[in-house]
Amino acid sequence: MAEIKNYTLNFGPQHPAAHGVLRLVLELDGEVIQRADPHIGLLHRATEKLAEHKTFIQALPYMDRLDYVSMMCNEHAYVMAIEKLLGIEAPLRAQYIRVMFDEITRVLNHLMSLGSHALDVGAMAVFLYAFREREDLMDCYEAVSGARMHAAYYRPGGVYRDLPDTMPQYGDSSKYRGEKEVRAMNDARSGSLLDFIEDFTNRFPSCVDEYETLLTDNRIWKQRLVGIGVVDPDRAKALGFTGPMLRGSGVAWDLRKTQPYEVYDLMDFDVPVGVNGDCYDRYLVRVAEMRESNRIIRQCVEWLRNNPGPVMIENHKIAPPSRTAMKSNMEELIHHFKLFSEGFHVPPGEAYAAVEHPKGEFGIYLVADGANKPYRLKIRAPGFAHLQSLDEMARGHMIADAVTIIGTQDIVFGEIDR
């Protein structure tokens, strides 16, 4: 009788569960994975090299396009690195706005992660539920920056503008939405952005309850996730896990608590931690994180309501002057012209800034040589370390479980391929 050999299967990059452009070369024994070899680089755009040929401000929008589901958190690490080198600090109000939008971004990311993970495993409803709330949060992005995704809202020294007093309204009824529905949507958008966010934080816990009703005790969901892709705490640390992947394995490491930046040390929140280190625990950690983010957003809204103030530093060598000042004062006009033609010069040195990104520790290592452009920009993407563990996590599991493991790793290729 002929010997049965292992066979090789190409999974992706066109596969709908491949989360973009992942190509996996799977070595299978029947339906059991013996080896998983991820091939990356299909979304490589030379971000680190491009940044060396742009001024510090011009390189900022590239950050949005790294992990294109957690846009503002990428920007945050970049502007923090520049601020370290310049030796400046954003005003307190700007810090609160940054923290609030970091947490809005975290919720956006986890909703996408949860919805697409459930869709990969075969639960379609959660995906549609999650995108209902994402729509509201995208409107917050649009209100402050004009863009729903690539906001470029954070700037060295603060944020681009203060929170607006009005929200964009939906137009007339269409074949997709009736008058009653449009009126209900616009009612929530009748006040300021802070009113809208506060209304969202009041509604959101019941939305998370809905997701949990659909998934947490669902027998099929538990059968697909419990005991799959188990990583013990020591191995998780050795593999370079951060974020929900590390906390799902039972290690309470969160940069917002261990190395607080901006105003996180003034916030009251808990760090959810898993027990078993399997896909189900990582799912529970992300759901709990959404609830904690909601608490932080609520605290920020309350503080921002009662404390008006500047959102950008006054140093016009770094931050552009106001439009009115620029049109009435020659010196301000010169500052404006210099900033937008040449940019500011950063003193020579190197800095590393890391934020607790929704996927883990997102770090920017920046080297400056005194010019108006970065000499070297190194991006530390959390998903890169997670993807390299895929082989270890998938071994001995079925092909169908590979989909679950990719979903639980929350892979986005913008940051992995850069």
UniProtKB/Swiss-Prot annotation:
Keywords: Cell inner membrane, Cell membrane, Membrane, NAD, Quinone, Translocase, Transport, Ubiquinone. HAMAP family: NDH1_NuoD. It is a peripheral membrane protein. One of its GO terms (cellular component) is plasma membrane. Its EC number is 7.1.1.-. NDH-1 is composed of 14 different subunits. Subunits NuoB, C, D, E, F, and G constitute the peripheral sector of the complex. The keyword Protease does not apply. This is NADH-quinone oxidoreductase subunit D. It is an enzyme of class 7 (translocase). Belongs to the complex I 49 kDa subunit family. NDH-1 shuttles electrons from NADH, via FMN and iron-sulfur (Fe-S) centers, to quinones in the respiratory chain. The immediate electron acceptor for the enzyme in this species is believed to be ubiquinone. Couples the redox reaction to proton translocation (for every two electrons transferred, four hydrogen ions are translocated across the cytoplasmic membrane), and thus conserves the redox energy in a proton gradient. It is found in: Cell inner membrane. It catalyses: a quinone + NADH + 5 H(+)(in) = a quinol + NAD(+) + 4 H(+)(out). One of its GO terms (molecular function) is NAD binding. SUPFAM superfamilies: HydB/Nqo4-like. InterPro entries: NADH_Q_OxRdtase_suD, NADH_UbQ_OxRdtase_49kDa_CS, NDH1_su_D/H, NiFe-Hase_large.
